[in-house]
């Protein structure tokens, strides 16, 4: 059943997928809190949506700062009341085309702080509040096809997206049985300002391209469902098949030894508490 979306929070909302998500929610009549570190661009885009009748609030926020993220959560719940959707979407591309040993450590750290650490902070700030309210909600993590398929010269970005995929999978397990669903958005190439003028890293594959609006539509249709992986590009199946076929070809484990087959299971331990 599609989640009734009356209120949404979108990070990385000043451009690209984040802006398209904000516009999609606003068009459906939802109130939207838009957050981004680029305050000037964010307020321009929010003003454009407001001029079209949208109910949006723009919050300039450095999402790598735990205190800032906590204030964002407070502001969002104060403005919107109950929140139905949180799109954990902030991201940067970082250095592309450089081998790992040539990427400045500070640049790699910056990519991880935005693509991974900021997503952790947003989840830690919003999920407890969502659980406390006890209403259905949906957390969308924006990862990437680079969480699965890695090419040359993409160490910082791909590693950060692998980490974010792991966080999303862990959150899904942690929240199973609650009313908060989790999905991970894994777009391939999307026509956004972040990738204009770039070519795909060698070995990453992926020739198809979609619009940010296409991606926002995919997310909209998935709200309230149990779909975890959201793939936006038509070549995703081929790219994933090639990736995992390669893994499977290298799985050549020997049969277990008799000792391994008979290895005893751990014994239960009883602890007596003295009061």
From Swiss-Prot:
SUPFAM superfamilies reported in the protein's UniProt record: NAD(P)-binding Rossmann-fold domains (SSF51735)
NCBIfam families found in the cross-reference section: HdxpentlteDhPtlF (NF045814)
Enzyme's top EC category: oxidoreductase
Catalytic activity field: 1-deoxy-11beta-hydroxypentalenate + NAD(+) = 1-deoxy-11-oxopentalenate + NADH + H(+)
Gene3D superfamilies according to UniProt: NAD(P)-binding Rossmann-like Domain (3.40.50.720)
Record function comment: Catalyzes the oxidation of 1-deoxy-11-beta-hydroxypentalenic acid to 1-deoxy-11-oxopentalenic acid in the biosynthesis of pentalenolactone antibiotic.
Pathway where it operates: Antibiotic biosynthesis; pentalenolactone biosynthesis
E.C. designation(s): 1.1.1.340
SMART domains for the chain: PKS_KR
UniProt cross-references to CDD domains, sorted A to Z: SDR_c
Gene it is expressed from: penF
UniProt GO MF annotations: oxidoreductase activity
Protein residues bound to NAD(+): 12-36, 161
One BP annotation, GO: antibiotic biosynthetic process
Origin superkingdom: Bacteria
Active site: 157
Similarity annotation: Belongs to the short-chain dehydrogenases/reductases (SDR) family.
Keywords from the UniProt entry: Antibiotic biosynthesis, NAD, Oxidoreductase
One Pfam family here: adh_short
Positions of substrate binding: 144
Stated name of the protein: 1-deoxy-11-beta-hydroxypentalenate dehydrogenase
């Amino acid at each position: 059943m599609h989640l009734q979306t009356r209120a949404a929070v979108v990070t990385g909302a000043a451009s690209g997928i984040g802006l398209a998500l904000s516009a999609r929610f606003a068009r459906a009549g939802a109130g939207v809190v838009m957050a981004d570190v680029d305050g000037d661009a964010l307020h321009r885009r929010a003003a454009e949506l407001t001029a079209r009748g949208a109910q949006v609030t723009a919050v300039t926020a450095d999402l790598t700062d735990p205190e800032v993220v906590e204030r964002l959560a407070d502001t969002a719940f104060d403005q919107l009341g109950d929140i139905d959707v949180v799109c954990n979407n902030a991201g940067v591309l970082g250095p592309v085309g450089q081998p790992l040993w040539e990427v400045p450590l500070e640049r790699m750290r910056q990519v991880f702080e935005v693509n991974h650490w900021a997503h952790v902070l947003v989840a830690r700030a919003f999920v407890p509040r969502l659980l406390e309210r006890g209403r259905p909600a949906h957390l969308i993590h924006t990862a990437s096809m680079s969480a699965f398929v890695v090419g040359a010269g993409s160490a910082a970005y791909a590693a950060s997206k692998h980490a974010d995929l792991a966080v999303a999978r862990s959150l899904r397990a942690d929240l199973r049985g609650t009313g908060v669903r989790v999905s991970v958005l894994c777009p391939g190439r999307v026509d956004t300002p972040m990738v204009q003028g770039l070519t795909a890293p060698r070995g990453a594959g992926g020739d198809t391209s979609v619009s940010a609006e296409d991606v926002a539509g995919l997310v909209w249709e998935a709200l309230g469902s149990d779909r975890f992986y959201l793939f936006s590009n038509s070549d995703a199946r081929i790219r994933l098949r090639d990736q995992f076929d390669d893994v499977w070809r290298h799985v050549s484990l020997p049969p277990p030894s008799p000792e391994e087959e008979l290895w005893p299971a751990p014994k239960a331990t009883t602890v007596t508490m003295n009061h």
